[in-house]
Regions:
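A short loop-to-beta-strand structural motif that recurs across blades of beta-propeller domains
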Residues: 44-46, 82-84, 133-136, 176-178, ...
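Beta-rich, blade/repeat-based domains predominating
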Residues: 17-32, 60-75, 102-118, 149-166, ...
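Hydrophobic alpha-helical segments and helix pairs
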Residues: 91-148
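Conserved beta-strand positions in repeat-built beta-propeller and related beta-rich domains
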Residues: 29-30, 35-40, 76-81, 119-129, ...
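Short loop/turn segments immediately following beta-strands, especially the blade-tip
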Residues: 180-187, 231-236
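A short beta-strand motif characteristic of beta-propeller blades
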Residues: 11-17, 52-58, 94-101, 143-149, ...
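Loop/turn-rich, solvent-exposed surfaces of beta-rich toroidal or solenoidal domains
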Residues: 176, 197-233, 244
Length: 246
């Protein structure tokens, strides 16, 4: 499928100068017209409204990914051990499944919902040394099922093609993007193939998303940029950033 390369209309600008230690997990809320994001290592959740208002909440452990709920108030968030529901208005926190209680050295990292509303989250070795990370699919009741087996030092993503039949995940330490066959009806993950590999000068592929034209946008940890790729993996554009780790 051919897509038109994106036009970059303006340079990146700072919307919240909070000097995060490890800022991640951007989630745009159409309902609130605001961006949710987290500082993983400082255990903080932020909301930056388009109108300029800035709010923050603190937790007792890492918080790494955010998704807005469709069937209830507040958010689904990944804490160190698993998924939880959090209502910013009341600060009520309800813990759901924690699938890696036996892996004391792991934590959850990136995550998001697919088009059917299932939440996906990946784990990683907190020390960034051992290949103990895996990917989990959470059902509507918050129960976790391991969808991709351990073997990952740092997981990031996922994101999907517009037709929902391919899921992309980032093998961050090994600098590669892996594409999996995907069944959107059941959430089943199929055969994997290397989709894109980066060199040392590119940094490490971190968070990513798919735009309305089907292009993948990939943040580069240590690469000071965000790159855009068409569905065949060819680079369409690059946006530089004032920070080395994006």
């Amino acid at each position: 499928m051919a897509v038109t390369p994106p036009r970059i209309l303006s340079a990146p600008r700072v919307i919240g100068d909070v000097r995060a230690t490890l800022g991640e997990g951007l989630c745009w809320s159409t309902r609130q017209q605001a961006i949710w994001w987290v500082d993983i290592l400082e255990h903080r959740l932020y909301r930056d409204a388009a109108a300029g208002a800035h709010d923050a909440w603190s937790f007792d452990e890492t918080i790494s990914a955010v998704a807005e709920r469709a069937d209830g108030p507040g958010l689904a968030v990944t804490l160190r051990r698993g998924l939880a529901l959090f209502d910013p208005a009341t600060r009520a926190l309800v813990r759901l499944d924690e699938p890696e209680r036996e892996r004391a050295g792991n934590r959850f990292n990136d995550g998001k919902c697919d088009a059917q509303g299932r939440f996906w989250g990946g784990t990683m070795d907190f020390a960034v040394r051992e290949p103990t990370g895996a990917f989990y699919r959470f059902d509507a009741a918050g129960r976790a099922e391991r969808a991709i087996d351990p073997g990952w030092i740092v997981t990031n993503g996922p994101t999907w093609t517009l037709d929902g039949r391919t899921m992309f995940v980032n093998d961050t330490v090994r600098r590669r993007v892996v594409a999996h066959a995907f069944d959107p009806a059941t959430g089943a993950v199929g055969a994997a193939r290397d989709w894109l590999a980066f060199g040392e000068a590119d940094g490490h592929p971190d968070g990513m998303t798919t735009d309305a034209a089907g292009r993948l946008w990939i943040a580069h940890w240590g690469g000071a940029c965000v790159t855009c790729h068409d569905p065949a993996s060819a680079a369409d554009n690059s946006v530089g950033a004032a920070a080395t780790s994006v």
